[in-house]
Amino acid sequence: MIRIFAGLCAALMLVAQPSMAMAAEDDAVPDYRVPKNAAKGKFVAHGQFKAVPFTAGEVTRFMFDGWAGKPIPVWAFVPSGVDVKEAPIMFMLHGAKRNPARYLLEWVPHAQKYGFVVIAPEFAARDFRGSRRYNLGYVFGRKDDRYYLRDEEKWTFSAIEPLFDHAVRELGSVQTGYTLYGHSAGSQFVHRFLYYKPEARVKRFLAANAGWYTMPDAEQVYPYGFKDPYGLTAAALGEDRIRMAVQKDMIILLGDQDNDANHESLRRTPEALLQGEHRFNRGASFLDAGHAQAKRLGVECGWRGAVVKDVAHSNGGIAKVAAKYVK
């Protein structure tokens, strides 16, 4: 059941789920500990992770080096029994624990049910350490205690588009765009990708349970808003980018039990606390901010919200609902 209601935010949707214990984000295991015969999917390793064709009905892993940044492992699942050329493509961004295998296994039954391809790049901590290099997109570098704007082709954000091109070629796909999904830190990646990659071929953004947000606000200092904090005028995002961003098709998914104000990984800076005391409230604040900016600018807001009942900070719990929104 989906119920539209006002109060929390004008565009927020309530998605009823049966009450059940969902796997918590904290229970995630590192990729290298996932057994080859994992219950929900069969892993196929191709040599030293060379670029290979995707394999229907199996979870595969390969190394992708077709961008200007460091080579990254990529996990993928192609559903069986579907026309792969026509199948929608979804990119899945993992959380701060850098656990794409776990995330992907939680998505396999839904991808098979709805018939879409899932591609999960792995931004390992050894190469993309901390939030600046991963969920903030590695837009800014730091040297000798000074920040600088990095070459765009080396941003973490910049791995996605060439990886999509690679997938289209390997699959023989006719798809011209994709869905971009992320949970937790991956959700932070997704909503900031929307700002920094306006020309990307994303059909729909699915941002789930982010811990904190870059608000569409030119007066708030980055990374909590668009205002330049480093004296790098060329890096500042302004009104035009806000206008573009709030018109994009984005669904903000929030578990109604993701309300632990003392969660060990929840950011508690003064700026983050202004967004709300926990993830659920911060997500609602972000959605409200997008609609407020759209109203101010006189444009139609493309942002919607989905509240997932009886789910806390769980990628698997969110996936049951998010899968229905893949385009």
What is the predicted function of each stretch?
Residues 124-154, 265-266:
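Cap/lid segment of the alpha/beta-hydrolase catalytic domain
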Residues 253, 264-267, 284-327:
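C-terminal catalytic histidine-bearing segment of alpha/beta-hydrolase fold enzymes
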Residues 91-93, 208, 254, 308:
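Alpha/beta-hydrolase
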Residues 140-171, 178:
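Alpha/beta-hydrolase active-site loop
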Residues 23-89, 101-102, 113-114, 145-148, ...:
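A domain-start/cap signature at the N-terminus of enzymes
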Residues 13-21:
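C-terminal segment of classical bacterial N-terminal signal peptides
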Residues 82-87, 92-129, 215:
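Short substrate-entry loop that stabilizes the transition state in hydrolases
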Residues 203-292:
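The feature captures the conserved acid-bearing segment of alpha/beta-hydrolase catalytic domains
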